Amino acid sequence: DVEIILVDDGSTDGTARIADEYEVAFPDIVRVVHKKNGGHGSGVNKGLELARGIYFKVVDSDDWLDREAYLKLLARIKEFCGEKESRKIPDLFICNYIYDHLDEGKQRVMDYKNVFPEESMCDWNGIRHFRPSQYLIMHALIFRTEVLRKSGVKLPEHTFYVDNLFSYQPLP
């Protein structure tokens, strides 16, 4: 059900060895690619190029996933993308997230309850207004892989803060 693509872009801290160990331990799930460092965008581009799944989610090296929330998300994806051929599968799943400010010892919860109907699918007409403090970042998004590819999104290399390109360019 899940494919994990680990993109090692020239890490010097033992990441490459650890990634390779995961690939050996979980060969049906984990694929590793080693490449020259090209920055965050380059790693995302490589992952998208190699992705074989219906959906694509970026998880950076400093991100973490809550197991219970992750399993709930997988169940929701399966529910919406069930075996009913007549059903249109969603182009995008949007998830709440927690932003950890480790330096300050603070957390900020970003939820979208006021924007999107909870636990259901909607179209553009079902979206309400964002608060000024709310925005979509790549870590809250799970795009259908085909949507990303058709959009032609390609993140710049050696550039920080490329979330807006990834988050908004694929939208109609």
What are these regions (language model features)?
Residues 1-172:
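Nucleotide-sugar donor-binding/catalytic module of glycosyltransferases
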